[in-house]
């Protein structure tokens, strides 16, 4: 059907309007894509600008620090009032200095390291305490799993060390009520293998204190003054983590008696011991810092180290008697798969003069004999052969090294 002239014109105008609309819509989409792209570029540039501004700010702060005058490092003695502090600066001496308004006076505690301005001696920064990484490694992170129940034949020693170490830490009010000073330290001495280190680990387990273990040989350094510095930092770390226990094993390596003569190495060891004596006199017993020392040679220790006030109690660890050896055998054979009828008392009688470590070694050797014969249980014969192996005292054992290696 043919359309009239006006209708035909309206149809053509509608088609033209529809095409024009599609054209403008496509243009709008293109422009929108361009706007989105430019917006994304703008955001990226803003992020880069913020990053560069942060770098500039850090560089300005670093430049300001580099342009600042140097500071003196001192140690706080005590606070005089709300605005003044007594500070010890080595080697100049002690000074009463002002505290910067940005520093809270409550944060300025005795023995903390601070920075003083070079021109006015104003305290403007609190510094962290300086501790050698080697000293930090001496702190035992994991609490030892040894308990008093794992120690046999040392009931008297356990009671004494509880009175000196555990009781002051858990119940200091008892000593205040009696009006007596808390003990500072204890010395464990006796032959090797009698349980000194084991008892120290059990004390650390039951007191729930920071346990710092150090061997005396670790404090012997080749450079002058290094050993004394490590001793100072050891006690600084103990004060920071109080309540704490410092266990010094093999103390005879630095605590031997002083002689008139001696080489340079001996004088350095003596210097380390003098610093240890100074620290034992310097820190207060009420600060919850206890010292446990262990040695096999109490006869060579310096008398200045053993006097009361430094070492308040000396606990002897003798070789276990028959009953003690029986208790140790029961403890170490508790988890072993034993056959019925094993007479542990007879085994204890076969080991006169044996140490606790040797008794434990007998249990281990008995298990090795059973393992060698592909058995899953240990017999009385295994224990007897283990005793014969561990306790053999023939003539070869007493030979000198020179004869032994000929």
UniProtKB/Swiss-Prot annotation:
Record-level GO cellular component terms: blood microparticle; cytoplasm; cytoplasmic vesicle; cytosol; cytosolic proteasome complex; extracellular exosome; inclusion body; membrane
Any single Pfam family the record assigns to this protein: AAA_lid_3
Keywords tagged on the record: Acetylation, ATP-binding, Cytoplasm, Nucleotide-binding, Nucleus, Phosphoprotein, Proteasome
SUPFAM superfamilies reported in the protein's UniProt record: P-loop containing nucleoside triphosphate hydrolases
UniProt key word Cytoplasm: yes
Residue list for modification N6-acetyllysine: 222
Annotated positions of the Phosphoserine modification: 120
InterPro entries: 26S_Proteasome_ATPase, AAA+_ATPase, AAA_lid_3, ATPase_AAA_core, ATPase_AAA_CS, NA-bd_OB-fold, P-loop_NTPase, Prot_ATP_ID_OB_2nd
Gene Ontology MF term list: ATP binding; ATP hydrolysis activity; DNA-binding transcription factor binding; general transcription initiation factor binding; proteasome-activating activity; TBP-class protein binding; thyrotropin-releasing hormone receptor binding; transcription factor binding
Claim: Ribosomal protein is one of the keywords in the record: no
PROSITE patterns referenced in this protein's UniProt entry, alphabetically: AAA
Subcellular location(s) per record: Cytoplasm; Nucleus
Ranges for region May mediate interaction with PRPF9: 186-406
One of the GO BP terms on file: positive regulation of inclusion body assembly
Residues recorded with modification N-acetylalanine: 2
Residues the record lists as binding ATP: 190-197
Protein purpose: Component of the 26S proteasome, a multiprotein complex involved in the ATP-dependent degradation of ubiquitinated proteins. This complex plays a key role in the maintenance of protein homeostasis by removing misfolded or damaged proteins, which could impair cellular functions, and by removing proteins whose functions are no longer required. Therefore, the proteasome participates in numerous cellular processes, including cell cycle progression, apoptosis, or DNA damage repair.
Family the entry assigns: Belongs to the AAA ATPase family.
Subunit details: Component of the 19S proteasome regulatory particle complex. The 26S proteasome consists of a 20S core particle (CP) and two 19S regulatory subunits (RP). The regulatory particle is made of a lid composed of 9 subunits, a base containing 6 ATPases including PSMC5 and few additional components. Component of a complex with USP49 and RUVBL1. Interacts with PRPF19. Interacts with TRIM5. Interacts with NDC80. Interacts with PAAF1. Interacts, in vitro, with the thyroid hormone receptor (in a thyroid hormone T3-dependent manner) and with retinoid X receptor (RXR). Interacts with ERCC6.
PANTHER family to which the protein is assigned, alphabetical: 26S PROTEASOME REGULATORY SUBUNIT (PTHR23073)
Protein name (database record): 26S proteasome regulatory subunit 8
Organism field: Homo sapiens
Name of the encoding gene: PSMC5
